[in-house]
């Protein structure tokens, strides 16, 4: 059934059988030695074909149990709420729409000069502002680039430095969009546990020793748990990463403009390739698809090549709109109020739950994390009967399901938080 004399020919033969349906998900491929004997080729030729199948996501190795055809990706959970739900939606991870800027106020400030092919990809004003903002966040002054959001930046950075099949260390539990991006880009997620102080250094070192070539780290407002790096934890991570200079370090500081937690440096001086990403989605709204990336010069060059091969640049209209918002003194004042409001939501829910003997750590960001001992479905269903739609935590798990609930607090007032706490208590004691 399988034929070919070279690794490419064997790969193409197996691929055609998958397309034709003669090889299906979970079907075992012949042992390397057996197929090599049948085709009268070297075993290394068959092994190379199988390795390419695995890298392409068409097969998976089961170790001593051989190599099997990989099934089509199963449906995955997506970030965002349900606009059609009759329930009070606390599942979406969205900012409060009432706290986003009125963009119409800034349209008159946009440049009337058309931008053409060959123009600088980053607007000069935004470039200068971003360089000042990120100067203290990087080991040395970084090159500034603009992407269509944080996940767009992370995917392009990984594809620039890594190959399909490479392992990437990520927090466990992990942001849904990061999980999905790694999956569809063909990378392998290597889970690293987090606690109230952030990613655990000893678990990260284990992942690096097992072959992870990059790490994606959230320094503040980790999604879904809300944890932020403590100074002690950041120093431990930085010291550990100094021993692995070849590892690509990507810092996803997505909540930088609204975080109530101080910035903690993690990138070591010895790290060869690094990037710090700060997006405006939670600040100006998810529809302003823009993230600012500061990186070392080699990483920036690779990123620009990937941008040039695709979208080339993020619309200068969006860039100018973001710059107008972020340099408006009135909106800066509103940002301060929003930062205090989101932090107060976290504290309020923690105190309200404490009255019922339920302890959670107040986090940072728009989401609260309620850890559970068992699967969250029953608790989420009980809360739904009380009128609340929350996000079940299992979808955020990388190595295993993460038992808990992610609850978006951004739109809740004090009275609603008190009611929610009472309903959580009832759901946990049903």
Swiss-Prot record:
GO terms for molecular function: DNA binding; DNA-binding transcription factor activity; pyridoxal phosphate binding; transaminase activity. The keyword Transferase does not apply. GO terms for biological process: alpha-amino acid metabolic process; biosynthetic process; negative regulation of DNA-templated transcription. Residues 4-72 form the HTH gntR-type domain. Keywords: DNA-binding, Pyridoxal phosphate, Repressor, Transcription, Transcription regulation. CDD domains: AAT_like, WHTH_GntR. It holds the Pfam family GntR. InterPro entries: Aminotransferase_I/II_large, HTH_trans_reg/aminotransferase, PyrdxlP-dep_Trfase, PyrdxlP-dep_Trfase_major, Tscrpt_reg_HTH_GntR, WH-like_DNA-bd_sf, WH_DNA-bd_sf. PANTHER family: HTH-TYPE TRANSCRIPTIONAL REGULATORY PROTEIN GABR (PTHR46577:SF1). Homodimer in both apo- and holo-forms. Acts as a transcriptional repressor of the pdxK gene, encoding a pyridoxal kinase involved in the vitamin B6 salvage pathway. Also represses transcription of its own gene. Binds to the ptsJ-pdxK intergenic region, but does not bind pdxY and pdxH promoters. Among all six B6 vitamers, only pyridoxal 5'-phosphate (PLP) clearly binds to the protein and acts as an effector molecule for PtsJ, inducing a protein conformational change that increases affinity for DNA. Thus, PLP stabilizes protein-DNA interactions, reinforcing repression. This is Vitamin B6 salvage pathway transcriptional repressor PtsJ. It comes from Salmonella typhimurium (strain LT2 / SGSC1412 / ATCC 700720).
């Amino acid at each position: 059934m399988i034929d070919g004399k070279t690794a490419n020919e064997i790969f193409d033969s197996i691929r055609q059988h998958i397309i034709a349906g003669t090889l299906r998900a979970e079907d075992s491929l012949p042992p390397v030695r057996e197929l090599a004997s049948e085709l009268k080729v070297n075993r290394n030729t068959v092994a190379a074909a199988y390795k390419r199948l695995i890298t392409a996501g068409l097969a998976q190795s089961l170790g001593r149990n051989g190599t099997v055809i990989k099934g089509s990706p199963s449906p995955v959970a997506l970030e965002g709420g349900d606009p059609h739900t009759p329930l009070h939606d606390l599942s979406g991870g969205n900012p409060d729409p009432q706290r986003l800027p009125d963009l119409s106020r800034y349209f008159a400030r946009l440049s009337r000069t058309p931008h053409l092919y060959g123009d600088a990809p980053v607007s000069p004003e935004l470039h200068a502002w971003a360089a000042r903002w990120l100067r203290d966040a990087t080991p040395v002054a970084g090159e500034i680039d603009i992407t269509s959001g944080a996940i767009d930046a992370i995917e392009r950075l990984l594809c620039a430095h890594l190959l399909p099949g490479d392992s990437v260390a990520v927090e466990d539990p992990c942001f849904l969009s990061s999980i999905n991006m790694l999956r569809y880009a063909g990378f392998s997620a290597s889970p690293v546990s987090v606690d109230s102080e952030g990613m655990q250094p000893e678990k990260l070192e284990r992942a690096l020793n097992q072959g992870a070539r990059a790490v994606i780290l959230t320094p503040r407002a980790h999604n879904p748990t809300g944890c932020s790096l403590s100074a002690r934890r950041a120093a431990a991570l930085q010291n550990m990463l100094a021993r692995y200079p070849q590892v690509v370090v990507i810092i996803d500081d997505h909540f930088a403009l609204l975080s109530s937690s101080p910035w903690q440096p993690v990138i070591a001086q010895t790290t060869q390739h690094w990037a710090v990403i700060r997006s405006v989605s939670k600040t100006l709204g998810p529809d302003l698809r823009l993230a600012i990336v500061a990186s070392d010069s080699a990483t920036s060059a690779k990123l620009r090549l990937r941008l040039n091969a695709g979208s080339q640049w993020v619309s200068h209209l969006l860039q100018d709109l973001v710059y107008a918002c972020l340099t408006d003194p009135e909106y800066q004042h509103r940002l301060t109020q929003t930062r205090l409001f989101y932090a107060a939501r976290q504290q309020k829910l923690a105190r309200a739950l404490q009255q019922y003997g339920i302890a959670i750590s107040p986090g940072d960001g728009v989401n609260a994390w309620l850890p559970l001992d068992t699967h969250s479905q029953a608790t989420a269903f009980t809360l739904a009967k009380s009128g609340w739609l929350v996000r079940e935590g299992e979808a955020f798990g990388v190595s295993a399901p993460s038992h808990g609930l992610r609850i978006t607090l951004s739109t809740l007032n004090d009275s609603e938080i008190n009611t929610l706490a009472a309903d959580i208590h009832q759901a946990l004691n049903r």
